[in-house]
Design a protein with these regions (language model features):
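Phosphate/pyrophosphate-binding catalytic cores of soluble transferases and nucleic-acid-acting enzymes
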Residues: 1-318
């Protein structure tokens, strides 16, 4: 029987340099990058999801991006099935798969598997949406906090789709999402994950977040949103709930078309830009909380583009 293949896993909060480290390692170790991010599976939503553009990939193949249209549903189980095929193909070609993990649930699905969850209940979902109407966008999150505090701590208050799914699972099974996922998993076979975690100092991370928001706006984030909407994509599409997209889109109220959507970063209200920064910082904290529970991680107290991080990661993987 052949020994398990190496699987590099780079995890850490947004703006910590996971992609930079993965690309550097791929160049040194004959690898390919497998993105593990629930926002990057959607086509056309590029700037605000921090997809590495083709020029930035430096010739390194990147997988598991641009998989579905904005209106399509894509689950952690879908990710597991498709990513596992990619991992095995990369290994079969004699190359090292390098996973860049920003979405903890997707990483759990890939490495540990997910238990059989209850099927969707459209009746329950309709009741939840009806109850939340007129009570504000965070009503369902407050409800989830009472039913399943652990899930509420991991899910953003405005991520309605994930909140409804967590409530649905709790109501239908009488168990928390963690309890459901802990039972009946099918771990990934044939690979030995080598986890490398990025944990830069918080002040430095927050400074990078602020810088990246500015860079995204300068790169044409608003123009991207305008272009997506002009193709007929609904404002209700899930990717428009992602950080930054929802704040920018709020500048073009329903019924007023796109004429009120600011054309460039400087024309956005300062309060909107600050809200994007704040939401991103909160997201980074949630990611850190999730990844802190991961076992057997080689933690590096720096960013992924730090030469020391690259040097130490190569040593871990050889």
């Amino acid at each position: 029987m052949s020994s398990p293949a190496r699987l590099a896993v780079i995890l850490g909060p947004t703006a910590s340099g996971k992609s930079a480290l993965a690309i550097a390692l791929a160049a040194k170790l004959n690898g390919e990058v497998v993105v593990c991010d629930s926002t990057q599976v959607y086509r056309r939503f590029n700037i605000g999801t921090a997809k590495v553009p083709p020029a930035g990939q430096k010739g390194i193949p990147h997988w598991m991006m641009d998989l579905v249209e904005p209106h399509e549903i894509f689950t952690a189980g879908d990710y597991r099935r498709r990513a596992e095929e990619i991992l095995r193909d990369i290994h079969a070609r004699g190359r090292l798969p390098i996973v860049t993990a920003g979405t903890g649930l997707y990483l759990r699905a890939l490495l540990e598997g997910l238990a059989d969850a209850p099927t969707r209940s459209e009746e329950l979902r309709a009741r939840l949406r009806e109850r939340s109407a007129g009570r504000g966008p965070e009503y369902l999150h407050r409800l989830l906090r009472r039913l399943d505090p652990g899930s509420a701590a991991r899910i953003a208050p405005r991520d309605t789709q994930k909140i409804i799914r967590a409530i649905e699972m709790r109501v239908l099974t009488k168990k928390s999402v963690n309890e459901i996922h802990a039972a009946g998993r099918a771990p990934l076979e044939g690979f030995t994950p080598i986890k490398i975690g990025l944990k830069p100092p918080r002040p430095a991370l927050y400074a990078r977040i602020e810088q990246r928001v500015e860079e995204m706006l300068a790169a044409g984030w608003q123009e991207e949103i305008r272009a997506i909407l002009s193709t007929g994509v609904s404002r209700d599409a899930k990717p428009f709930t992602f950080i930054g997209y929802r704040e920018i889109l709020a500048q073009a109220p329903v019924g007023e078309g796109l004429k009120t959507l600011p054309l460039s970063g400087p024309s956005l209200p300062a309060a909107t830009i600050n809200e994007i920064r704040k939401s991103t910082r909160h997201f980074a904290k949630r990611q850190q909380t999730w990844f802190a529970r991961e076992s057997n991680v080689h933690w590096l107290p720096t960013f992924g583009d730090d030469p020391l991080a690259i040097e130490r990661s190569v040593a871990f993987l050889r």
